[in-house]
């Protein structure tokens, strides 16, 4: 893939993608490499922007699939718009923006130790920028793309649980 452009399988037959694509299955069966020539993308191992999510920025990922613990299925990809001004996200301890609220404007490598003192984020509201939620502290584990808008429950961002250990702004590197 080539994203923004993204090339999937840049060592052989490839597919160039320059925007969101909800179903890449018809383009190829397997993906062994990815090259992002410009922009940033989130790739998914299921169609319709579902399943495991993987963040891609400019660069070549010749053996990314094995290193990231990802199978060789890339079934959808979403372009992440560049954002360079302020970042703002509100995190809530309950569904539907209920309970204690915490606002972030910068990265947080350990949500429990540094700021929120809870392990679970059940809902959030992004007013500025794009963010990545990570399942564990220090930007490890499953990741989830959080775009501007309201998320009334963790399942709306693709979360399997409300567990969020760290949060990072997606900046144009």
Language model features with spans:
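Compact beta-sheet-dominated domain cores in extracellular/mature segments
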Residues: 1-173
């Amino acid at each position: 893939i080539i994203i923004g452009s993204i090339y999937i399988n840049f060592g052989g037959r490839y597919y160039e993608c320059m925007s969101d694509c909800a179903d890449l299955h018809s383009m190829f069966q397997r993906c062994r490499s990815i090259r992002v020539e410009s922009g940033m993308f989130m790739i998914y191992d299921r169609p319709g922007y579902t399943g495991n999510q993987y963040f891609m920025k400019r660069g070549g990922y010749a053996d990314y699939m094995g290193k990231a613990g990802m199978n060789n299925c890339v079934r959808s990809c979403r372009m992440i718009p560049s954002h360079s001004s302020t970042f703002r996200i509100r995190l809530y301890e309950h569904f539907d923006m209920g309970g204690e609220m915490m606002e972030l404007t910068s990265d947080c490598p350990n949500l429990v130790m540094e700021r929120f003192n809870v392990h679970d984020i059940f809902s959030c509201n992004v007013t500025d920028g794009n963010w990545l939620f990570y399942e564990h502290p220090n930007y490890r584990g499953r990741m989830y793309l959080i775009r501007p808008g309201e998320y009334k429950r963790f399942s709306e961002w693709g979360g399997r649980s409300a567990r969020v250990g760290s949060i990072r702004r997606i900046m144009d590197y």
